[in-house]
Amino acid sequence: MTKRLNRRSFIKTAAIAGAGLALIPNKAFAGNKKPIPTEGKVRIAFIGVGLRGRNHVSNISKNPDVEIVAFGDISADAVAEAQKIIKADGRAKAEEFTLGPTDYLRLLKKPNIDGVVISTPWEWHARMAVDTMKAGKYAGLEVSAATTLEQCWDLVNTYEATGVPCMILENVCYGRQELAMLNMVKKGVFGEVVHARCGYLHDLRGIKFNNGVEYGTKSFSEAQWRTNFSEKMNADVYPTHGLGPISLALDINRGNRFLSISSAATKSRGLHEYIVEHPKGGENHPNADVNWNLGDVVTSTIKTSRGETIIVTHDTNVPRPYSLGFKLQGTNGLIEFDGLESGGIKQPDGSYLNTDRIYIEGKTEPHEWESAAKWFKEYDHPLWAKFEAEAKNTGHGGIDFFVDKEFVDSIKEKREPELDVYDAAAWSAVTPLSEMSIQEGGEPQFFPDFTRGKWMDRKAVDIK
């Protein structure tokens, strides 16, 4: 068990609280303007430079079109690490904002900032993005974008009042397999899509606890804040990694929308057992008495306006390998894969047996699965073919390169990002709505129409 603790990556080291700024309308961004290249470099600041934030720093620092101007974090040590990254890339030292939890507001007042990447704990995401948009700066917001319906509406309302874009930085939308799946959908491989499945299935016990089995104030990194959600909420608290790519495939907010969600949760056993069985835990450890609210597996069924269903699973408290559990099914066939180019099943010789599979009527052998490998290759997205060499050494198998590139490009071209504020609101709304559904015994909860009817006329995302 100790080995599991040591092999995890920890991110988002500090919570940064926020307060509102005066509303600063920016009509230059209102509506869907044609791309207008900016003069000079795109000036980027970062709020939150823990491990996740520093991953963004590392990626964006390699972009020659960018000037990195500021870091904000309550941890001076985290900022010092971020400074080392840009110094190694030959960049000048960025201005630092480390005077306390509201010092990011001083950062946002700086006139020499075009966009802000926000990588802080979930509960601060929405308020910081709202303040960023009010300051007239593009907001690049880590996932999930919001934890309440009120926060979802705050994001949308602020965008519509200011015209300043907000991009949800959902990196899995740029996964090679995920984009190949999207390509297959666009080219009609599956026929008319009727059903999908996705989720976040990831053993996070070694992230939710450290220093043995500590969390909160006695721990560090994500365990300081993420574990609190397992104690306080019974919901799908992290839906966007799986739901983002599926939403693009189903044209959510662009000709289709989520209508309702019905959710159920299992009992909670995994975190308690982890504590009592850990060498530094035990039955007498104070945390053995914690009443964990989050069910070990949360399952939600979403219905869409076009008649598809989506099953979304959250599974982070019990032992398991990583998976995003993708399935997409249409009138011609279906595909199933774990996502992020999972290695598959490890063989005795150390190699891996790929388990990605596809069935297309009339194209594959009747009633038999076929490896999806050649299909992924045939429908490889042009984005990957063009930028594979640049992406290969960046985070999460290259997908972080693409999400950061899109954020910077959208600022440079003065356009809406491919993943916008309506996506941020709709995908993140799964958390509060699933919580309400579980509390009401699985009763369906209805999604607000965050687009206020615009989903009927908005065009499908054209990732390029």
Write out the residue ranges for each language-model feature.
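Short beta->alpha connector loops at strand-helix junctions that form conserved
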Residues: E142-S144, E170
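N-terminal glycine-/serine-/threonine-rich beta1-alpha1-beta2 phosphate-ribose binding loop
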Residues: T2-L141, W153, N157-P165
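Active-site beta-strand termini and strand-to-loop segments that position acidic
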Residues: S300-R306, G330
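C-terminal helical cap and adjacent loop that interface with cofactors, partners, or active-site loops
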Residues: A14-G18, F29, N55, S247, ...
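Non-transmembrane alpha-helical segments in soluble domains
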Residues: I11, V57, Q83, L105-L108, ...
